Amino acid sequence: MKSVFRFTFLLMLVVARVFAQDSYQELGKKALLDGNFKLAVVQLEKAMVADSTNLNALYMLGYSYYHAEDYKKSVAAFGKLISLKPSETSAYYYRGKARSFMANYTPSIANSEREKLLLSAIRDFSRAIDLNSDDLKYYQNRAIAYHDYGVLKAQKIPRLYDKPRAMEALKACIIDFQKVLEANPGRKDIATQLEEARSHLQNVSKQ
């Protein structure tokens, strides 16, 4: 009798845990779809407490952190997702974008930290391209990261300035932008960014 009672009690605990996890996940999903990313974070964090390996909840949590502009936590969430599912292409993409935002918009960020973030973003976009070479937004975002890195390394600041690396990054940026523009000739925004990259490369080559 005691064994039956214990089994029933444990079963009820498992069912309650699964129900709580599903409820929080569904509430988080609804908030996400409604564009209320901060509320989505609250619910999805609870879902992760119930099951820290829930890939769907983890993806939505990283996505919600990103759109709530909590880029550091977004990077951490997508990093965990990648450790559980290395083939999740979108996780690399959003982690790369989060790192790019951190590099460019973190107040008083050190140049050394900005450099690390941009290089990490480039690696993330490159990995996304390895997994799905047909999605042009990966090339576009890698081009932007290459551009930002090239401009950073072109600054004549001790222990930062590196003309060869700056030129290499800007050339890579141009190649990626050209690929996007060839597939979408009407993209004036890409054409403008491409010309800016060419101009920066020309200026750096004269330094």
Feature names for model-found ranges:
Residues Q21-Y24, L55-N56, T89-S90, L136-K137, ...:
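Helix-start (N-cap) detector for alpha-helical repeat units in TPR-like alpha-solenoids
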Residues D22-S23, L27, Q155-Q207:
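Terminal, low-structured helical/coil segments at or just beyond the last alpha-helical repeat
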Residues L33-D34, H67-A68, F101-S108, D148-V151, ...:
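Register position in tetratricopeptide repeats
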Residues K46-A47, K80-L81, R127-A128, V180:
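Canonical positions in the second alpha-helix
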